[in-house]
Amino acid sequence: CTPSGTICSPEAPEQCCSNSCVPHQWLRIFVCA
């Protein structure tokens, strides 16, 4: 799975180890929670 802090797709949160893909604090990307 994708570790925390790695870029991810909000449409596919299951790719993250945490099952959560969240907006980055200041960059316009999503990262695993």
Swiss-Prot record:
The keyword Disulfide bond applies. Coiled coil: none annotated. Disulfide bonds join 1-17, 8-21, 16-32. The record marks 28-29 as: Reactive bond for trypsin. It holds the Pfam family Tryp_inh. It comes from the Eukaryota. Keywords: Disulfide bond, Knottin, Protease inhibitor, Serine protease inhibitor. Belongs to the Mirabilis serine proteinase inhibitor family. The presence of a 'disulfide through disulfide knot' structurally defines this protein as a knottin. This is Trypsin inhibitor 1. It comes from Beta vulgaris subsp. vulgaris.
